[in-house]
Amino acid sequence: MKITQEEVSHVAKLSKLAFSPEETAEFATTLSKIVDMVELLNEVDTEGVPFTSNVAANINYMREDVAQPGWNREELFQNVPEKERGYIKVPAILDDGGDA
């Protein structure tokens, strides 16, 4: 399956990433090769092989949910670079609008 440069550019835009035309072409080629390798798995004969969703015998061990004391607020706020109205202020990672 061929991944086009347009598809790579579209996903990059949705991910807020910017690539040069050379990088976009390289990603398209590499991703196409990866998809081709994964598609080879469709040719594997699995007749008679039992379905397994997990080969390890995992067991969920539950514990009682007990509230524990949290951080000392004053001590915590001594270690933050910026605070505003009782909250820790962090840099914005999302802008207004966009396709995503």
Swiss-Prot record:
It holds the Pfam family GatC. GO terms for molecular function: asparaginyl-tRNA synthase (glutamine-hydrolyzing) activity; ATP binding; glutaminyl-tRNA synthase (glutamine-hydrolyzing) activity. It catalyses: L-glutamyl-tRNA(Gln) + L-glutamine + ATP + H2O = L-glutaminyl-tRNA(Gln) + L-glutamate + ADP + phosphate + H(+); L-aspartyl-tRNA(Asn) + L-glutamine + ATP + H2O = L-asparaginyl-tRNA(Asn) + L-glutamate + ADP + phosphate + 2 H(+). Keywords: ATP-binding, Ligase, Nucleotide-binding, Protein biosynthesis. Its EC number is 6.3.5.-. Allows the formation of correctly charged Asn-tRNA(Asn) or Gln-tRNA(Gln) through the transamidation of misacylated Asp-tRNA(Asn) or Glu-tRNA(Gln) in organisms which lack either or both of asparaginyl-tRNA or glutaminyl-tRNA synthetases. The reaction takes place in the presence of glutamine and ATP through an activated phospho-Asp-tRNA(Asn) or phospho-Glu-tRNA(Gln). Heterotrimer of A, B and C subunits. HAMAP family: GatC (MF_00122). This is Aspartyl/glutamyl-tRNA(Asn/Gln) amidotransferase subunit C.
